[in-house]
């Protein structure tokens, strides 16, 4: 019985499908769409897959529809002219109330889409333009595109929660664009006894985009880490990347850092700002 002032539909991909989650994509998608039944306004990304179906569901339930897009100028919130300025990202936004340039200090070109979603909510609830601008400029999320670099910036480490096909593809495309020519080392794993499709998806994507993949633990639970990593490795091997299996995550990160003898980006994905691992039935 919780009522929301606004509900955002940003994207949808194949995920959370397993014997203990959703039985298939249709069930997963339908579950996502149910949020509109509890919202006064629907904020819909016109650039997402299945946007027509999302809009149809929103119109059946919500009295107000706000759309956002980087490709469709007819959207309620339209973003364009995206460019880098030093470490910041600048982009222009047109809404029913104003047209102006915004600035993000959070890395990742894909965060422009997230910013447009936030501005759609601002439109829904009437947040003043100056507050929206100030909020986005200061926006930071622990475990989301956190960048660390050594003194000469030849080695950059990006910590991110990316953990499924959609987020992996988005992350790698952004890194390729923002760090051209850099060697890419990726450290990740998959959870135990669920979301089995991720092992294939993440293995294929990391093998395609990385120079080195180090497979490690990511909440293995009661499934042996080595078994999970071997499952992923068969798909990594289909790409051009070298790979290794290092079950202990701390040691895997250390090996990634020690492997850097040229300009490199290290991607530590899946865990974000989390500080625990699920091993067996306990969180350590």
Q: Model-derived features: where do they sit?
A:
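Acidic, Mg2+-coordinating active-site environments of NTP-dependent enzymes
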Residues: 2-157, 233-237
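ATP-dependent carboxylate-amine ligase
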Residues: 62-64, 97, 117-143, 147-284
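Short acidic, glycine/serine/threonine-rich loops at helix termini
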Residues: 1-2, 54-56, 199, 278-280
């Amino acid at each position: 019985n919780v009522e929301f002032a606004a509900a955002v539909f940003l994207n949808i991909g194949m995920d959370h499908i397993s014997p203990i989650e959703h039985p298939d994509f249709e069930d997963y998608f339908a579950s996502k769409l149910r949020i509109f039944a509890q919202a006064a306004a629907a904020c819909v990304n016109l650039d997402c897959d299945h946007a027509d179906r999302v809009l149809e569901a929103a119109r059946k339930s919500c009295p107000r529809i706000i759309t956002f897009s980087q490709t469709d100028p007819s959207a309620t919130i339209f973003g364009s002219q995206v460019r880098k300025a030093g470490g910041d990202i600048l982009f222009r936004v047109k809404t029913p109330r104003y047209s102006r340039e915004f600035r993000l200090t959070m890395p990742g070109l894909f965060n422009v889409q997230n910013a447009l979603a936030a501005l759609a909510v601002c439109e829904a609830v009437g947040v003043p333009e100056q507050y929206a601008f100030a909020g986005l400029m200061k926006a930071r999320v622990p475990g989301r595109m956190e960048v660390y670099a050594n003194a000469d910036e030849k080695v950059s480490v990006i910590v991110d929660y990316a953990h499924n096909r959609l987020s992996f593809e988005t992350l790698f495309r952004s890194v390729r664009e923002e760090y051209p020519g850099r060697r890419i080392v990726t450290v990740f794993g998959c959870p135990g006894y669920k979301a089995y499709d991720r092992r294939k998806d993440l293995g294929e994507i990391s093998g395609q985009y990385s120079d080195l993949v180090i497979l490690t633990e990511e909440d293995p639970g009661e499934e042996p880490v080595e078994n999970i990593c071997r499952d992923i490795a068969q798909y990594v091997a289909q790409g051009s990347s070298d790979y290794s299996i290092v079950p202990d995550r701390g040691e895997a990160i250390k090996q990634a850092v020690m492997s850097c003898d040229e300009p490199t980006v290290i991607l530590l994905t899946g865990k974000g700002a989390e500080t625990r691992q699920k091993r067996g039935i306990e969180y350590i």
